[in-house]
């Protein structure tokens, strides 16, 4: 979503592969705010990048204990996602490329579109532009007009055409090219 909205997108390291926060034990806390014990601290979101599934996750050598614990790099790492066309990394790179190619995604006006409960749809660009984004958080269908899925979170649907009603799965998002009326 952040790559389809106006402004400068910000990805914190690990976002591009879907890294999740790593539990940090009290003894491993390094964040000064967390050391005070008044708040959990920021360490769970600052753990080492998971570059590969090997020892140290490609961040450090085997046997070296990093500043903060490493997450499950076997389940989620850059090396594996580079080879997977359906990965979060590939989706992120493709959305960045689409944003680079499409001025409306970088600086076009935002307008909210009518959306059923559990969905959010918006348009970027001039009023006559037909590029729309939809994000579904529920189970309803969206009426958007005939068009094509340019890029979606379900990569098997990229290029899929629809005749007016678009169904998105739970938590599915898509950048759409809608045919002119």
Language model region names:
Residues 131-132, 158-160:
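A conserved amphipathic helix/loop scaffold
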Residues 1-128, 134-139:
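Loop/helix patches that line or flank the sugar-binding groove of alpha-linked glycan CAZymes
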Residues 160-181:
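C-terminal beta-strand-rich structural cap/linker in extracellular carbohydrate-active enzymes
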Residues 56-57, 155-158, 173:
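A short acidic, often aromatic-flanked loop/helix-cap motif at beta-alpha or helix-coil junctions
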Residues 137-156:
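Beta-strand-rich binding/interaction modules
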């Amino acid at each position: 979503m952040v790559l389809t909205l106006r402004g400068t997108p910000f990805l914190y390291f690990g976002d591009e592969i879907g890294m999740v926060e790593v539990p940090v034990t009290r003894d491993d806390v390094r964040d000064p705010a967390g050391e005070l014990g008044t708040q959990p601290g920021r360490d769970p979101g600052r753990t080492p990048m998971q570059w590969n599934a090997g020892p140290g996750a490609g961040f450090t050598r085997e046997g070296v204990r990093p500043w903060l614990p490493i997450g499950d790099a076997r389940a989620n790492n850059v090396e594996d996602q580079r080879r997977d066309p359906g990965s979060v990394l590939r989706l992120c790179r493709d959305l960045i490329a689409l944003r680079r190619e499409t001025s409306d995604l970088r600086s076009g006006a935002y307008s909210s579109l009518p959306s059923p409960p559990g969905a959010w749809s918006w348009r970027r660009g001039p009023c006559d532009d037909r590029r729309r984004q939809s994000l579904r958080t529920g189970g309803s269908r969206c009426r958007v007009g005939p068009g094509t899925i340019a890029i979606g979170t379900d990569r098997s649907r990229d290029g899929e055409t629809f005749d007016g009603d678009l169904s998105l799965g739970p938590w599915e998002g898509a950048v759409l090219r809608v045919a002119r009326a």
